[in-house]
């Protein structure tokens, strides 16, 4: 039977206590500002919040969970159903360094204005997006995002992040690792 012919699960009654494990209230979500190679850089300060999924990636240590080691251990809704959902919360001028994923990564601003960038060097591109706009990056595309909201320097804004797969992998670009090394050398 092909995927197109696959039968739907039989409908059953879901008790409230069962469904309560699949409900997350934004006000109760907990995130982390640690767990990624660029977490300590001042321009990368951000809180990542794991709502659904983000199992730790399997395999080599050069790959990290897109939401960081801390967050991959604490989803609000602990399911593995082919996608992951989280939020990034940060102030203007903040966001991750360029990185890549092994699956699709889609962004949708909830609040504020965000710049989504892709490629490095001569091929660099970007687009500015606002609430409910959507940018969907394919695997193998170096990408990053940054809060660019004006006139609110101390206000954290929220970006929705959806990433395909059960245990997606992220890897920072060589240029990003050079910036991390430079920062670490200056801290020594």
Residue positions per predicted region:
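Double-stranded beta-helix
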Residues: 2-18, 142-188
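Short acidic-glycine-tyrosine-enriched beta hairpin
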Residues: 108, 120-139
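Conserved short histidine dyad/triad with adjacent acidic residue
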Residues: 66-73, 84-101, 139
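Glycine- and acidic-residue-biased ligand/ion/polar-headgroup-sensing regions
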Residues: 92, 103-115, 120
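A short, N-terminal "cap"/entry segment at the start of jelly-roll beta-barrel domains
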Residues: 1-81, 188
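Short histidine-centered beta-strand/loop micro-motifs
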Residues: 74-78, 96-101, 118, 126-128, ...
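Histidine-centered metal-chelating micro-motifs
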Residues: 94-97, 115, 133-135, 139-145
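A structural connector/turn signal
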Residues: 85, 95, 104, 124, ...
């Amino acid at each position: 039977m092909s995927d197109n012919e696959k039968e739907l699960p039989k409908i059953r009654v879901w008790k409230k206590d069962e469904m309560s494990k699949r409900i997350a209230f934004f006000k109760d979500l907990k995130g982390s500002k640690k767990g990624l190679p660029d977490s300590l850089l001042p321009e990368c300060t951000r809180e990542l919040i794991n709502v659904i999924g983000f199992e730790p990636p399997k395999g080599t240590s050069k790959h990290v969970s897109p939401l960081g080691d801390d967050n991959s251990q604490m989803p609000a809704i602990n399911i593995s159903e082919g996608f992951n959902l989280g939020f990034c919360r940060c102030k203007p001028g903040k966001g991750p360094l360029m990185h890549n994923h092994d699956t699709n990564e889609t962004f949708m601003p909830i609040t504020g204005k965000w710049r989504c960038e892709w490629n490095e060097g001569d091929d660099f591109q970007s687009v500015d997006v606002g609430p409910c706009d959507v940018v969907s990056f394919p695997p193998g595309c170096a990408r990053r995002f940054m809060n660019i909201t004006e006139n609110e320097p101390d206000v954290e804004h929220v970006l929705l992040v959806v990433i395909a797969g059960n245990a997606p992998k992220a890897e920072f670009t060589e240029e990003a690792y050079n910036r991390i090394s430079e920062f670490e050398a200056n801290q020594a």
